[in-house]
Amino acid sequence: MKNLQISLGLSLLLVISACTNNENKHKAAIDLAAAWVEASYTSQDAALSMVNENMADEGVSLSDRYVGFGFVWNPEGDGMVIDYVVPESPAAGVLMEGDSFIEVNGIKLTNENRNNLGFRGKPGENVNAVIIRDGVEKPISIARGPVQIRYSKEQVVNNISNGDAESWGPEDFNIIEAGVTNDGVVYVLHWSEFVEDATGYKANAYTVTRFMFDEEGKVAWVGNLSEDRFVLEQQGWKITR
């Protein structure tokens, strides 16, 4: 029994030692990942500097997945004009930048109803629409499907630059812990609390951010998993079928 206890104790020490050595080996990556998250919360300037200085030129930032078409439009403008079509999305090969929706499932699109049309819903279902392309009306049909946007470094910089510096960041945040795998992939667990501008409702959520690095120590891949449903419920939303 005593020999077994000694053996287990030595095994535990070896595991702890291996974990410590691994963290020491990747300390620079862990520190950079934690600093990246902190900068993203702190200010627009801090976030912009962090990306410019530490994201690889060929690096990518992944958005949350959703079911839809796979296009981006500017809600600050009138109507619904396509700014960007996500590669390999249902919209790829059907929509083009500059296309403007005028009708969706038989309903004329207006500024008032454009957020309540049939773009979201069950995957696989077709949505019929009419767009204007180069001044000519064109009927289209697209089946909803999974979409995930991969932002390039240039797009990440543009997205940050187009943000509002005055309202940047949460009310409060905390970097809880960071860890690393044997392959050098870093995970950062963090928490934030924020207020929805339109309603004044306060919400909070935990988020895990995953980082991969290139040989030069630059961020090559970054993506988040968060408590999206929990946030929506705190803001008074509910899921309906």
Q: Which functions belong to the PLM regions below?
A:
Residues 1-8:
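Bacterial N-terminal signal peptides that target proteins for export
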Residues 91-111:
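Conserved PDZ fold ligand-binding element
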